[in-house]
Amino acid sequence: MELLKKYPKFFQWLFLLIVFFSLCFAIEVPETYNFIRGQAEFIKDPNQSTYTLFGAEVRYYAFDVFWRLPPLLGWLPIWINDSLFFLMNEWMPMEFWNEDIQEFRTQPLLLQITRNLTSFMTFLIELIREILLGGVETIVSFSSWDWIDANPWAELPGLPWTIVTAGAVILGYKLSGKGLALFAGLVMIYISVFGQWKPSMQTLSFILVAAPLSFLFGLTFGVMAFKSKRVEKFLYPILLVMQTMPQYAVLVPAIVLFGIGDHAAVIITMVVAVPPMILLTLLGLRGIPSEVIEAGRMSGCNNWQLMTKVLIPTARRDILIGVNQVIMVCFSMAVISAFIGAKGLGFNLLLALNQLNIGLALEAGLCISLIAILLDKMSLAWANKQIDYFGNLTYFQRNKNILFFAAAVILGIIFSYLGSFYFKDGSNYLFEVPHNKGISTADFWNKGVDWIWDTFFHTLKIFNTWLIVDVLQPMRALYLRMPAVATLVLVIGAGYIIGGIRSALVVGGLTLFIALSPWWDRALVTLYMATFGVFISTIIGFTVGIISFQNKHTANFMLGVCDIFQTFPSFVYLIPVMMLFGVTDTSVLIAVIVYATIPATRYTIEGLRSVPEALHDAATMSGVNKVQRLLKIEFPLAFPHMMLGLNQTIVFALFMVIIGAFIGTEDLGQYILKALSDKKGAGIGLTLGLCVAFIGLIFDHLIRTWVGKRKKHLGIG
C-alpha cells in the first residue's frame, strides 16, 4: 500500500496496460477476417451478408463490434460531396452579367464567387510571372488578342536574370551584409547557369502572390482574435486542426471549388499558410507588456492608432517570424500543388519522380531547396534587423540601395540588348539561359545511382528484406491486431491519467471519430509507420541533442543544420531514399526518420540551454560532475521542453508518412492520393484528412497537458 501511495501514477499506467492487453487477448479476430501473412494484413471476407446504414455498406456480425466498430460515419464523405454540389450548383441562384455572351445569366452565388476569385488570382500570377519572364496575358486582360497582334511592341519583355540577381544581392546586403549578399548571388547564378531559370521564376511568382496575401489575412485574423475572445475561441479549434491536417487532403476540395491550375494552388496555399501567421500574430500581440499599452493610451491614441502605431510595431519580430513561416509553408506547397497543375520547379520534380529520373529530380529539388533557404535567411534577417533611422544622412546615403538597383536595371537591359547581337544561336544568355542550353548534372547523378545499385545491391537488398520481413511486417500485424474497443480504452485511460475527465473525453472523442470511419485499419497502418519513425527519430534526436549541447560551437552548428534541413520541402527527402531502396516502405520510413529527427534535436538543445545558469553554478559548487549534472539537474528541467519536441516529431512524422503515399504506402495517405483523381473525392479526402489530423491532435493534447502540469510542478515557465 505504501508503494501504491508513493507511486500512484505508475500503478495507474500498469493497470491500464494490463486491461489493454487483456482485451487484446480476449477479443479474438472474427471469422469474417482472413490474415494474409505475406502482406501482414487482415482482409474482410467478401462472402458475408451486408446491410446499409446512413448510405454506407456495413459487413458486420454482432460479435464483430468489439473488433472493429461499424463504420457509422460512412455517410460523412457522401454528405460533404452532396453539400459541395448543392453549394456550387443550386445555392442562391442570381443574375450575373456574362461577358462572353453579352447578357445576364443565372448562376449560383458560390460558383460566381469562385470564378471571380479564380480570375483575380490568375491575373496576379500572370502579372508577376510576366514581369519576371515576359508575356502578353496581362495586357490581353485589359485589351484583346487582336490589339496585341496589331501592336506586338506591347508584349512585356521580362527581366533579364542579371537584373533579378542584382536585386537579390542588394536586398541580401541590405538585410544582413556581405555574407547573405554573396549567398543570394551564388543561388541566382546557379539557377540560371543550370537552365532552371524559367521554372524557378514560375515558382517564385507563385510565392510572391500567395505569401503577401497569406500575411494580410493572417495579420487581420490575428488582430481580430487579439481584440475579441469570441473570435479567438472560434478560430482556435480550426487552427489546431489545420496545423495537423495533411496538405494533400486540402487539395481535393480545392479542385471542386476552383478547378486545377496555378490559381487553385495559390488559394489552397493561402488556406494552409494563414494559420501559422494568425498564431504568431496573436503570440506577438499577447507578449506586449501592459505598460506599453498604457503608455499608448496616455499619449491619446485611439484604437486604430494604438494598434498600428504601438502594438503591431512592438510585436514586429514575432509578426515577421510569422512571415518566415508563411514563406516556408508556401514553398512546401509549391511542390504539393503540382498535383493540381501548378507550374514551376514542383511540377518538374513531380514529373522526374514519376519517371524515376533521380538526376532531374535532384536538380529540381536542389533549386527548390536553395531558393527556400535564401528566402528563409532573408526573412529571418528582416525579422532580426533593427529599424533604420535617417537623421542627418544625405539623399544618396538614404537611398543608395534603390539607386544601385536602378543602375543594375539599366546596365542589365543594356547588356541584354548587346547580348542579342553577340549570341548568334538564337539564345541570349544574358537574358535567360534555356533549359536545354544550361549545365546539367542529371547524367552524373543517374550514373551515381547505377553505381550504388551495382556496388551495394546485395547489401541494400539484405537490409531492406530484413527490415520489411523481420521488423515492419510483424509490427504492422501487431497494430492491425489491436481491437477497436481495446484501443479506445487505452486512449481514454491515458487521457484520464494525464489530464482528468476532460482530457479523457477529448481524446476519446477524437479516437471514436476515427474508429467509426470506414478507414480504421488504414489509420492503424498510418500509426504503425509514424510510431516506428518517431521511435527512431526520438532516440537519434535526443542523443545528438544531448551530445551537441556539451559544446557551444557544436550546438550552434547542429541548430544551423536543423535550420537548413527544416527549410527543405518535404518531398525532397524522398529523392535520396528512392535512390537506395526504391519504392518500398523502407524508403518512406527512412525519409520519415530524417525529417522527424529535426525537431527532436532542436528542442533537446534548446531545452537544455533553457536551464538557468544559476543552477549550473550551484551544481558546480556542490561538486557534481558533468554526468551527474546532466542526469540530476539539466535533463529533468529540460524534459518538458524535450517532450514538446516529441510532439513536433510526431506531427512531422505524420506529414511525411502521408507524403510517402506518393511512392506506394498503404495507409491513409494512399487513399487521399486516390481521392485527388476521383471527381467525387472531396468528401473522402476531407474525412481522411480529419482522421490524420485527429491522430496528431490526440498526441498533441496528451503531451501538452502533461508538459503544462510538469512545468507547474517544477515551477518553471
Curated annotation (Swiss-Prot):
Subcellular location: Cell inner membrane
UniProt source species: Pelagibacter ubique (strain HTCC1062)
Entry keywords, A to Z: Cell inner membrane, Cell membrane, Membrane, Repeat, Transmembrane, Transmembrane helix, Transport
InterPro entries: MetI-like, MetI-like_sf
Protein name per its UniProtKB record: Trimethylamine N-oxide transport system permease protein TmoV
Transmembrane segments: 10-30, 69-89, 120-140, 153-173, 175-195, 206-226, 238-258, 265-285, 319-339, 355-375, 402-422, 452-472, 488-508, 527-547, 574-594, 643-663, 683-703
Pfam family, one: BPD_transp_1
Its biological purpose: Part of the ABC transporter complex TmoXWV involved in trimethylamine N-oxide (TMAO) import. Responsible for the translocation of the substrate across the membrane.
Domain of life, source organism: Bacteria
GO terms for cellular component: ATP-binding cassette (ABC) transporter complex
Family: Belongs to the binding-protein-dependent transport system permease family.
GO molecular function: amine transmembrane transporter activity; carnitine transmembrane transporter activity
GO biological process assignments: choline transport; glycine betaine transport
Residue stretches making up the ABC transmembrane type-1 domain: 200-379, 523-703
Record note on quaternary structure: The complex is probably composed of two ATP-binding proteins (TmoW), two transmembrane proteins (TmoV) and a solute-binding protein (TmoX).
Topology versus the membrane: Multi-pass membrane protein
